[in-house]
Regions:
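A short SAM/SAH-binding and catalytic strip from SAM-dependent methyltransferases
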Residues: 94-107
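A short glycine-rich, Lys/Arg-flanked "PGG" loop and its adjoining helix->strand segment in the class I
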Residues: 108-122
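Class I SAM-dependent methyltransferase SAM/SAH-binding core
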Residues: 38-85
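Class I SAM-dependent methyltransferase Rossmann-like catalytic core
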Residues: 1-29
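Conserved class I S-adenosyl-L-methionine
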Residues: 124-149
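A short acidic, Gly/Pro-enriched loop at the edge of an enzyme's catalytic core
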Residues: 85-95
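Short helix-loop-beta connector
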Residues: 30-36
Length: 225
């Protein structure tokens, strides 16, 4: 991933991620009060601003692995190591994250998140499924190891009973194959590895995929009982 270089262009390019943030906020009643909120993977705060407008809260703690020099105080650390930090001993009635989970070891961090969640607390997450950016995977061979809807549900069922999972598919269309990869670059996602964008490669992409790019968002709403 390459989010810092794309900092100035990310919010404009990451239309799907912004839409996912809107979908997550729809799961929460307007003006619902939360005593303690923890959001991880906050990046430049696009989802943070949406969620803060939707709810009422006493304390809101932010995390990200990178320092974007935000005006808000952000705890900088790798969420894969959350169990090693004092924050993991606190209790929250809302833990949220938008379009971050795919970068993490979900099975590893979920027990800690479950312990951090207070009784009747809500876990509100979005990620991407196994068909995310499938055109890129087929054309370059490069991909993250995305979990399927079934795999995510199975992991959640080890710790929770009230589980709601939804998935969607969004296909974006571009004017040229070069625009597809420019979109990915501007949104901070490096899906090419060391692959070179030759004219032959771009023509082949256009022929096979008609300059389309598919996202596979997954939405998770869990309540601790």
């Amino acid at each position: 991933m390459n989010f810092l270089k794309a900092k100035s262009s990310y919010e404009k390019a990451a239309k799907v991620q912004n839409w996912m943030g809107d979908r997550l906020c729809e799961k929460i009643p307007a003006n619902k009060f939360f005593d303690q909120v923890f959001e991880f993977g906050c990046a430049q705060g696009e989802f943070t601003r949406k969620l803060k407008k939707k709810i009422i809260f006493k304390k809101y703690i932010l995390n990200d692995i990178l320092d974007y020099k935000s005006q808000d105080k952000v705890e900088i650390f790798d969420m894969n190591d959350i169990a090693q930090y004092p924050l993991s001993t606190q209790k929250f009635d809302l833990i949220a994250s938008n379009a971050t989970l795919q970068w993490l070891n979900f099975k590893k961090i979920l027990p800690t998140l479950a312990n951090m969640l207070d009784t009747k607390g809500i876990l509100l997450l979005s990620t991407f499924g196994e068909k995310n950016l499938e055109q890129i995977t087929k054309s370059t061979g490069f991909s993250l190891k995305y979990l399927s809807l079934f795999e995510i549900k199975k992991i959640l069922q080890e710790h929770f009973f009230e589980i709601l999972i939804e998935e969607d598919f969004i296909t974006l269309e571009f004017e040229s194959p070069l625009e597809v990869f420019r979109h990915l670059k501007l949104s901070g996602v490096n899906s090419l590895g060391h692959h070179t964008l030759t004219k032959t490669f771009l023509k082949d992409y256009e022929k096979k995929f008609q300059n389309k790019l598919t996202y596979h968002p997954i939405f998770i709403y869990v309540k601790k009982v």
